[in-house]
A protein has these predicted regions:
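Conserved HGGG/HGGXW glycine-rich cap/lid loop of the alpha/beta-hydrolase fold
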Residues: 4-52
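Structural signature of beta-strand start/N-cap positions in the alpha/beta core
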Residues: 13, 39, 79-81, 104
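Active-site signature of alpha/beta-hydrolase-fold catalytic machinery across serine-
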Residues: 29, 94-98
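Active-site catalytic pocket residues across diverse enzymes, especially alpha/beta-hydrolases
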Residues: 34, 99-100
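Active-site loop/oxyanion-hole signature of alpha/beta-hydrolase fold enzymes
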Residues: 42-83
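Gly/Ala-rich beta-loop-alpha elbow adjacent to hydrolase catalytic centers
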Residues: 83-92
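Flexible "cap/lid" loop of the alpha/beta hydrolase fold
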Residues: 97, 103-135
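Conserved alpha/beta-hydrolase catalytic His-Asp/Glu region
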Residues: 116-119, 135-154
Length: 154
């Protein structure tokens, strides 16, 4: 997980969470514009950052935990605005559940309402995700080496 920061001269902290299947680069122009008014932290999940192709996305819960640790360490656990789009809303919901964080305003843009079950095994998660998202997940849903090999072939 990597954090890109803009507008550090501003006091209000906005954390932006991108959707699934895309990288943080899709939100970069918006983050730069918002940095004219806010201190923006744009999050790049493991497995979705082109600059870190060796990383693997584990779960929205893992990304939220790591983001929470980062915010507590660097900003005392306070987020003024938490913005998530699409699958980023899954991470957003997990961040909201973190008792160590204080979030003033939340924007959940395009939030899916499907529950993410607490499945312990990786195989079980793969089967669950395959049936709910189809073949696309099987091919592209494991960011990192598998996606890199697949994209190199097409």
């Amino acid at each position: 997980m990597k954090y890109f920061e803009f507008g550090q001269e501003h006091s209000e902290l906005m954390v932006m969470l991108h959707g699934g299947g895309v990288s943080y680069l899709g939100m970069l122009p918006t983050a730069k514009k918002l940095a004219e008014r806010y201190h923006v932290v744009l999050v790049a999940y493991d497995g979705f950052n082109p600059g870190e192709p060796e990383t693997e996305f584990v779960s929205p819960m893992d990304e939220a935990r790591r983001l929470g640790d980062y915010v507590v360490e660097h900003y005392g656990g306070k987020i003024d605005i938490l913005y998530g789009i699409s699958y980023g809303c899954r991470v957003l919901m997990e961040v909201l559940a973190d008792k160590h964080l204080t979030v003033t305003t939340t924007i959940a843009d395009g939030m899916g309402l499907r529950d993410y079950p607490n499945i312990k095994s990786k195989w079980g998660k793969d089967v669950y995700c395959f049936f709910f998202t189809g073949l696309f997940y099987a091919v592209m849903g494991h960011p990192g080496p598998r996606r890199k090999r697949f994209l190199a072939k097409i």
